[in-house]
């Protein structure tokens, strides 16, 4: 297939948009076979079925590399509590927060969880997402964690989107283990990880390293098992405080360290050395009305790749708009529109260990977005506006 009359944002490298005016893209199945100026299309592709894109902007398809779209229940009441002065930590310690979602998720059927998740996934797809990471972590027992991961796998069969799963058993201490996180890690989390891996449900292993969740020693035990199973790792780190999560992620060579509001310059250096991606999540920052901004300048200084995601979840980021996440990253964190677009494409792919996505180049996946926009900065600039004209998934319109 040949796409012509396009203004192509290749993102060939991280320095600029790599814009090709009057460009063309040839695909072969689900891969990009050639990209360049329309005048230079090789003869081998000129006889292909041609689609004139009308001079529209084409970018790599968007990737949401950090979501919790599978969950039961609703936590809108907590929104009111926080507006009345309760902190995220206070809500959690009072039995709300993640634990309230755990109760609802445990009680929901797979069918109900899938139906609810698909409403969120549909919103992401409508703004150009073709790859979504989905975490467990609202079960905190064997059966429900496995149930969540099975539902996550079913999303890819129910919708034209790819899904990568992350086992997040170390998300919170469930009520039945209150005050005894070590027993939970050893008796529930690690055995469940083994079971999920045996069932083929896990692509990566995640954890929440924070004062209200698990410390570095507890997370390390989970990561050691992940290593034995050959699974890559990710980590929620330095969202509400700094207890060494980012350094831990770097030591383990994690794919990503996520949130990272309280990361330091030394943490940024560690991420750069390990090649770990910093995933910033402005939806949670915004919803929780936080004031500590991720150290974007340090990430730039040390050439740490910055990814960006919705963090769609019921408590701290009920966000299903990647375009709004891009705007938030620019407005709240002072990222540039180029950084935001890279964060939702090439760097998001890196945060998932995907090497063939996020850029428009020969050999890459033919996942593309066609936009009614003049310049790529418009994607992060406008609010409440979806300029998506067409989403191309695996080379198919």
From Swiss-Prot:
Keywords: Cytoplasm, Histidine metabolism, Hydrolase, Iron, Metal-binding, Zinc. It is found in: Cytoplasm. Its EC number is 3.5.2.7. Gene3D superfamilies: Metal-dependent hydrolases, Urease, subunit C, domain 1. Pathway: Amino-acid degradation; L-histidine degradation into L-glutamate; N-formimidoyl-L-glutamate from L-histidine: step 3/3. InterPro entries: Amidohydro_3, HutI, Metal-dep_hydrolase_composite, Metal_Hydrolase. The keyword DNA damage does not apply. Zn(2+) binds at residues 66, 68, 236, 311. GO terms for biological process: L-histidine catabolic process to glutamate and formamide; L-histidine catabolic process to glutamate and formate. Fe(3+) binds at residues 66, 68, 236, 311. NCBIfam families: hutI. Catalyzes the hydrolytic cleavage of the carbon-nitrogen bond in imidazolone-5-propanoate to yield N-formimidoyl-L-glutamate. It is the third step in the universal histidine degradation pathway. HAMAP family: HutI (MF_00372). Belongs to the metallo-dependent hydrolases superfamily. HutI family. This is Imidazolonepropionase. It comes from Roseobacter denitrificans (strain ATCC 33942 / OCh 114) (Erythrobacter sp. (strain OCh 114)). The lineage of its organism: Bacteria, Pseudomonadati, Pseudomonadota, Alphaproteobacteria, Rhodobacterales. The gene is hutI.
């Amino acid at each position: 297939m040949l796409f012509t009359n396009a203004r192509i944002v290749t993102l060939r490298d991280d320095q600029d948009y790599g814009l090709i005016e009057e460009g063309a893209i040839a695909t072969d199945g689900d891969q990009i076979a050639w990209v360049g100026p329309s005048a230079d299309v090789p003869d081998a592709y000129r006889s292909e079925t041609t689609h004139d894109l009308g001079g529209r902007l084409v970018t790599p398809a968007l990737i949401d590399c950090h979501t919790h779209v599978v969950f039961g229940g609703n936590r809108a009441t907590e929104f009111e509590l926080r507006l009345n002065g309760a902190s995220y930590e206070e809500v959690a310690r009072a039995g709300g927060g993640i634990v309230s979602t755990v109760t609802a998720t445990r009680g929901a059927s797979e069918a109900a969880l899938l139906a609810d998740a698909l409403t969120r996934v549909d919103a992401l797809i409508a703004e150009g997402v073709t790859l979504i990471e989905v975490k467990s972590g609202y079960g905190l027992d064997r059966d429900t964690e496995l149930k969540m991961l099975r539902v996550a796998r079913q999303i890819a069969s129910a919708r034209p989107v790819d899904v990568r799963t992350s086992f997040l058993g170390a998300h919170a201490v469930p009520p039945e283990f209150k005050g005894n996180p070590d027993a939970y890690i050893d008796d529930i989390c690690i055995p469940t990880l083994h079971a999920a891996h045996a069932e083929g449900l896990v692509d990566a292993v995640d954890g929440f390293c924070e004062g209200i969740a698990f410390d570095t020693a507890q997370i390390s035990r989970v990561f050691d098992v992940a290593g034995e199973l050959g699974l890559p790792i990710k980590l929620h780190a330095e969202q509400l405080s700094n207890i060494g999560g980012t350094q831990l992620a770097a030591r383990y060579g994690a794919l990503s360290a996520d949130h990272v509001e309280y990361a330091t310059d030394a943490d940024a250096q560690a991420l750069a050395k390990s090649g770990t991606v910093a995933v910033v999540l402005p939806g949670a920052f915004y919803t929780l009305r936080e004031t500590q901004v991720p150290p974007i300048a340090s990430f730039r200084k040390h050439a740490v790749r910055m990814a960006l995601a919705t963090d769609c979840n019921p408590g701290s980021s009920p966000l299903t708009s990647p375009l709004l996440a891009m705007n938030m990253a620019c407005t709240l964190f002072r990222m540039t529109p180029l950084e935001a677009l890279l964060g939702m494409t090439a760097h998001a792919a890196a945060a998932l260990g995907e090497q063939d996505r996020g850029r428009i180049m020969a050999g890459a996946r033919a996942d593309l977005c066609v936009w009614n926009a003049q310049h790529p900065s418009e994607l992060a600039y406008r609010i409440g506006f979806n300029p998506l004209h067409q989403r191309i998934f695996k080379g198919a319109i």
